[in-house]
C-alpha cells in the first residue's frame, strides 16, 4: 500500500471515530476523541511521507476542527 492510500485509510478511520463520539456513551466519548486524534495524526504523517503536503494541510485543518468540536461539545462529558 502506498503512503497516500495509507493516509486515506487513516483518515477514514479518524472520521469513523469522530462520528462515534456522537453515539458514544458519556464515559466512551474521550476514548473516541483519542482514537480520532491518533488516526488523524497517522494520516498526516503518511501524507507528508508521500509528499502530499496539500493533503497533510487539509488533514491538519480537519483535526483542529474536530478538536474544537470536542472541546466545545464533549469535554467533561462523562467525567
Show which residues each predicted segment covers.
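Short amphipathic alpha-helical heptad-repeat segments
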Residues: 3-13, 29-41
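Alpha-helical linker/edge segments of TPR/alpha-solenoid repeat scaffolds
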Residues: 7, 61-79
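Extended, non-membrane alpha-helical segments enriched in charged/polar residues
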Residues: 19, 38-45, 61
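Short, charged, amphipathic alpha-helical segments
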Residues: 29-38, 53-64
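Extended rod-forming repeat segments used as scaffolds/tethers
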Residues: 12, 16-18, 42, 57, ...
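Amphipathic alpha-helical repeat scaffolds of TPR domains
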Residues: 2-23, 64-65
Amino acid at each position: 500500500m502506498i503512503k497516500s492510500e495509507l493516509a486515506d485509510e487513516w483518515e477514514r478511520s479518524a472520521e469513523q471515530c469522530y462520528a462515534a463520539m456522537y453515539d458514544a456513551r458519556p464515559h466512551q466519548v474521550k476514548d473516541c476523541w483519542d482514537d480520532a486524534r491518533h488516526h488523524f495524526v497517522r494520516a498526516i504523517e503518511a501524507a507528508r511521507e508521500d509528499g502530499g503536503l496539500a493533503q497533510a494541510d487539509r488533514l491538519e485543518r480537519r483535526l483542529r476542527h474536530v478538536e474544537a468540536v470536542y472541546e466545545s461539545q464533549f469535554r467533561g462529558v462523562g467525567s
